[in-house]
Each structure stands twice: as structure tokens, then as C-alpha cells.
Amino acid sequence: RSGKLDAFLVLEQLRCNGVLEGIRICRQGFPNRIVFQEFRQRYEILAANAIPKLRNWQWWRLFTK
């Protein structure tokens, strides 16, 4: 029916798409975002040449928006 939501179906879609798991993780206090410098330090080894080694703060702002 138009304009009607099936609560069970909505909940099932949220569960299947991982939304409920993400909410559960956030409620436990785990961060859902990290700053670019931390991301770069953690994952640089996977693609060392793909992430530029920039020192200019204006460039960092582009990555952290």
C-alpha cells in the first residue's frame, strides 16, 4: 500500500544492510571515523604510493572533509 510501512520489512532491510550492526558498534563506544593522518599511518603499507605525503595543511583539509 502506498504511504504504509511494514515495520518488520524495514527492520529486516536495516539488519541485512548492516545498519543495525553499525548502530550497535557505535553504542559500544567504538569510533565510526578516524582522522586522515591515523588512516594514512594505518593503511599506508597497503598502497604506499597511492597516498600522497603532503605536509601542507590545506591539502590535508581536502582529505578530511
Curated annotation (Swiss-Prot):
Pfam families hit by this protein: Myosin_head
Domain Myosin motor: 1-65
Subcellular location: Melanosome; Cytoplasm, Myofibril
Keywords, alphabetical: Actin-binding, ATP-binding, Coiled coil, Cytoplasm, Motor protein, Muscle protein, Myosin, Nucleotide-binding, Thick filament
GO molecular function annotation: actin binding; ATP binding; cytoskeletal motor activity
Keyword ATP-binding: yes
UniProt GO cellular component terms: melanosome; myofibril; myosin complex; myosin filament
Cystine pairs: none
UniProt KW Transmembrane keyword: no
Classification via SUPFAM superfamilies: P-loop containing nucleoside triphosphate hydrolases
Stored PANTHER family: MYOSIN (PTHR13140), MYOSIN-11 (PTHR13140:SF857)
Subunit organization: Muscle myosin is a hexameric protein that consists of 2 heavy chain subunits (MHC), 2 alkali light chain subunits (MLC) and 2 regulatory light chain subunits (MLC-2).
Function recorded in the entry: Muscle contraction.
Free-text comment about domains: The rodlike tail sequence is highly repetitive, showing cycles of a 28-residue repeat pattern composed of 4 heptapeptides, characteristic for alpha-helical coiled coils. Limited proteolysis of myosin heavy chain produces 1 light meromyosin (LMM) and 1 heavy meromyosin (HMM). HMM can be further cleaved into 2 globular subfragments (S1) and 1 rod-shaped subfragment (S2).
Protein family (similarity comment): Belongs to the TRAFAC class myosin-kinesin ATPase superfamily. Myosin family.
Protein name: Myosin-11
